[in-house]
Amino acid sequence: MTMQAQLGDKTFTLERFPLDQKNRSLQAWDSADEYLIDYVSEHHPDCRSLLILNDSFGALSCYFSHKQLTVCSVNDSYISHQAAAYNLAENKIPAITFSQLDSLSALPEQVDLVLIKVPRTLGFLQYQLSELSEVLAPGTPVIAAAKTKDVHNSTIKAFEQFIGETKTSLAVKKSRLIISHAQGGYKAADFPVNWPLEGTDFTISNHANVFSRDSLDIGARFFFNYLPETNKAKSIIDLGCGNGVVGLMALSRCPNANITFVDESYMAVESARLNVELNMEAKYEQCSFVENDCLSGFERDSVDMVLCNPPFHQAQAVTDHIAWQMFKEAKDTLKEGGELRIIGNRHLDYHDKLNRMFGNCKLLGSNKKFVVLSATKNTGML
């Protein structure tokens, strides 16, 4: 399908990342982006500096940078950062007044206007609004957008709590705006969250945008039963590490292994780093922490084992391309005889995917909801 996006008065070519994903029906912008652009053009034509939060693939960044505004884009996604930079370059938009920050960086204090694409996680929204409340001058407009089905009472209450008086717009193309103005005064959000990891002496620390932020998720709990308990694996990757509990437990059972924690979320990688530092400080030097698009750029044939709990969401879309990419790049990164060990929901049919890719797949365990699978890299079998 075409990737031509008519945004305001200009047509852009916008690509969704990763570029080689199989589902080309997913596009890099949505009606919420269009609504924000039209609203700002009509109601804030004199805006010169803009702070954008959660611009998934750079649609907003491209439009307002094209208009020669000073744009700072803040995101928790490494992939979103790559997409924005790529799309600006593809549309030949100079990035002279464009900058990007990760979700844990200090926000700029001098902006005319804030735009937010509402994230899936309420806790992450609360964290972002809290950070804004600390830096915005009173009266600064804050305008958010989301699909109408994703604007809940709790969403509105978060804006009222951290920013100020809030109203919503009429729906246009199934999207809605949330319009607020900073009232001044910092209002703290309780992040990171700390909780005890059951069955261990570990305390887990989670930043706001990390999955299952205040307890162990049931998938990881089941996966713990099938983690390696041998020093045979000298190098292990926790791929899509989240808060790092899987890699942390692997390190506790394989104390001589080098563990690499990889995620595309800056908050996830920082949570994993904190959790190793808090709970296994003596092993910290055996660990590395990497924000990345899966394992792209990793050395081929270099690791003994990859542990993975693949996600099946990207932004608001349900998709399996991330799992496919993880499996393919894990195979490339594994040494001959190396193992990919995963947990997944039963209905996702990962067994068939791994068989097709590796030429083998073994069921290690299952319950009503999950399966734990193992695939070994053996090029002679393919």
Curated annotation (Swiss-Prot):
EC number of this enzyme: 2.1.1.174
Disulfide bond residue pairs: none
Keywords from the named record: Cytoplasm, Methyltransferase, rRNA processing, S-adenosyl-L-methionine, Transferase
Protein family (similarity comment): Belongs to the methyltransferase superfamily. RlmG family.
UniProt subcellular location: Cytoplasm
GO molecular function: 23S rRNA (guanine(1835)-N(2))-methyltransferase activity; nucleic acid binding
Name of the protein described by the UniProt record: Ribosomal RNA large subunit methyltransferase G
Catalytic activity: guanosine(1835) in 23S rRNA + S-adenosyl-L-methionine = N(2)-methylguanosine(1835) in 23S rRNA + S-adenosyl-L-homocysteine + H(+)
Superkingdom per UniProt: Bacteria
Major localisation: cytoplasm
